[in-house]
Amino acid sequence: MTIKSDKWIRRMAASHNMIEPFAPDQVRVSEDGRKIVSYGTSSYGYDIRCADEFKIFTNINSTIVDPKNFDEKSFVDFKGDVCIIPPNSFALARTVEYFRIPRSVLTVCLGKSTYARCGIIVNVTPFEPEWEGHVTLEFSNTTPLPAKIYANEGVAQVLFFESDEICETSYADRGGKYQGQHGVTLPKT
């Protein structure tokens, strides 16, 4: 597998709608002139943005977290430009971008250092061959203080790896449960 460059990312976004909406270069300043956490195409990856839809974890209903039988009451829905994650808690969000991953490609996503240096960890599982949808983002606040997440700004970087051989069965072929997801998607079994 080889990592793909900015040229390949731009070409695939233009010819295959791999990323929509797409920023062909790094964006570091908002349209109104404010400094922001960067997003867009980088040398060997794409910095994704967080949309303004969040699900903030709460223990108000005193449920047990069970990935096989997840209780939606474990989250409080929030929409806004800034999400405050309580100390030692987490939140879910989704990307602004919608992805269509080619059959020969697998991605790995890593949190941006701007957030990591503040104790905020971004977790995203790989985007598998022929998966498509908005990406559900997991933010963990590892600090004893409330932490801010900024909507419509960069939060993580996606690295694209292309195999020298096409996979036998893609995510779409096996009817993956998160195929075509829109919005913040909770666990499914």
From Swiss-Prot:
Oligomer status and interactors: Homotrimer.
Protein keywords: Hydrolase, Nucleotide metabolism, Nucleotide-binding
SUPFAM superfamilies assigned to the protein according to its UniProt record, in alphabetical order: dUTPase-like
Domain of life: Bacteria
Catalytic activity: dCTP + H2O + H(+) = dUTP + NH4(+)
Family in the record: Belongs to the dCTP deaminase family.
Enzyme nomenclature, EC number: 3.5.4.13
Cited HAMAP family: dCTP_deaminase
Record's function text: Catalyzes the deamination of dCTP to dUTP.
Involved pathway(s): Pyrimidine metabolism; dUMP biosynthesis; dUMP from dCTP (dUTP route): step 1/2
Name of this chain's protein: dCTP deaminase
Active site as annotated: 138
GO terms for biological process, alphabetical: dUMP biosynthetic process; dUTP biosynthetic process; nucleobase-containing small molecule interconversion
Hydrolase found in the keyword field: yes
Keyword presence, Lyase: no
InterPro entries (alphabetical): dCTP_deaminase, dUTPase-like_sf, dUTPase_trimeric
Organism: Paraburkholderia phytofirmans (strain DSM 17436 / LMG 22146 / PsJN)
GO molecular function: dCTP deaminase activity; nucleotide binding
PANTHER family: DCTP DEAMINASE
Positions with a binding annotation for dCTP: 112-117, 136-138, 157, 171, 181
